[in-house]
Amino acid sequence: VAISLWQTGGVRGNQKEMRRLNLLSSIYGDRLREEIREKLGASYSPNAGVSGSEALEDFGYLVGQSVGKPEDLDLLLKTMRDLADTLATEGATADELDRAIKPTLGELEQTLRQNSYWLGTVLSKSQQDPARLELARNREADYKSITLEEINELAKRYFKAESALLVSIKPASPSE
């Protein structure tokens, strides 16, 4: 397994940035899939995501990961870092943002019809965090307002080569 991580902030009080990071991770994931799966053929399902703590304001991360042969892990890690570096220096394209936002908006619409979203995500914590109600009300408008400039600024801020944590997990050799 090859894993690349970059520290971000948490979710608490920072939901607008987390929404933008969600789209950035989607763009990064598409680039991982195109390069690692389609061009290199080194892994079937590379992916990316973002996670932020609700309890710790300064704890969150962007992650890219891919399962591959042990002999390919260094190549996978280099590819992950190179793709993040390119996003940081050259930015994403309008087409990439469009491809990231359309499925997200579709998912948002689906959750509006699900009790699990309203009860589990919004209402269950709204008494201790009343802002959740407003976040639920404005999430679609907020996603639709996200600009390419915002995404590219986040890529520059977080995808710094010197702050990348690259991890590979390999099976033990037979002699161990």
Where are these regions (language model features)?
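M16 family metallopeptidases and their MPP-like homologs
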Residues: 1-16, 24, 37-145, 163-171
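Short Ser/Thr-interspersed hydrophobic loop/turn segments at strand-loop and sheet-helix junctions
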Residues: 28-32
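Short, exposed beta-strand-loop hairpins at the edges of beta-sheets
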Residues: 155-157
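Extracellular/periplasmic ectodomains of large secreted or surface enzymes and adhesion receptors
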Residues: 175-176
